[in-house]
């Protein structure tokens, strides 16, 4: 099992999570 693979998947997951939270934050700020 490659450490780099895990790190890559994890950072991808974090980016998606952050993007979703950012969109929610934008929605809440605009309304």
From Swiss-Prot:
GO cellular component: extracellular region
Induction info: Produced in the A cells of the islets of Langerhans in response to a drop in blood sugar concentration.
Family, as annotated: Belongs to the glucagon family.
Pfam families according to UniProt: Hormone_2
PROSITE patterns assigned: GLUCAGON
Protein name: Glucagon-5
PANTHER family linked: GLUCAGON, PRO-GLUCAGON
GO molecular function, one term: hormone activity
